[in-house]
Amino acid sequence: MAGHSKWANIKHKKAAADAKRGKIWTRLIKEIQVAARLGGGDANSNPRLRLAVDKAADANMPKDNVKRAIDRGVGGADGANYEEIRYEGYGISGAAIIVDTLTDNRIRTVAEVRHAFSKFGGNMGTDGSVAFMFDHVGQFLFAPGTSEDALMEAALEAGADDVSTNDDGSIEVLCDWQAFSAVKDALEAAGFKAELAEVTMKPQNEVEFTGDDAAKMQKLLDALENLDDVQEVYTNAVIVEE
């Protein structure tokens, strides 16, 4: 996408996250439970749990909440046996959308996801219909003004795969998703704190939306995001605010 919108988009995303912190905590608790159930309660030897715990810290979740979620996952308590299901579909003008869910009732979840797609101008696709348009990566975004040369040296030494500067001056670092925690630790040790650091499904190509189409696409994305069983929504659509 055009680099000018990178920084605006991430600031918008952070503001939206702050506005719905309670919902984010609920999602993180589910993810922590599942990660602990599948890989054990030690974040040092469980990369998925480490990532979830780091996200919880970034979201200012109390450590007691994190510990309880880990204990529930390890102990197999009621509510910890969520099923991971990915749905794929299309938004306005065929924009690609991936919806990752954790659910204890797949019939309810698929009905809710399908309803959101159909109500707001999209449609469900089949498994694999759009996932090939995305790459599973670790992504870091640094504020404009960050020293590009110093960051590039630190990032490549840490094991990152790509460093690029956007038109707005922000710098993006990409790495293999499995190397995310190691790269994050190395960058922070070198004095670089990312404004955004996440494992994500990054679209290979992006499509910008403006005007009415942008508003329609945002409504669809919001409807999917607001479903209780939804953990993450990924899209190749970029909403340009005019």
UniProtKB/Swiss-Prot annotation:
Q: Recite the UniProt keywords alphabetically.
A: Cytoplasm, DNA-binding, Transcription, Transcription regulation
Q: Which GO terms describe its molecular function?
A: DNA binding
> Among its keywords, does the record have Transcription?
yes
**Lineage: superkingdom:** Bacteria
Q: Which InterPro entries match?
A: Integrase-like_N, TACO1_YebC-like_2nd/3rd_dom, TACO1_YebC_N, Transcrip_reg_TACO1-like, Transcrip_reg_TACO1-like_dom3, YebC-like
Q: Which GO terms describe its cellular component?
A: cytosol
BP-aspect Gene Ontology terms: regulation of DNA-templated transcription
Q: Does the keyword Membrane apply?
A: no
Q: Where does the record say this protein resides?
A: Cytoplasm
Member of which family? Answer: Belongs to the TACO1 family.
What protein is this chain from?
Probable transcriptional regulatory protein Bamb_2332
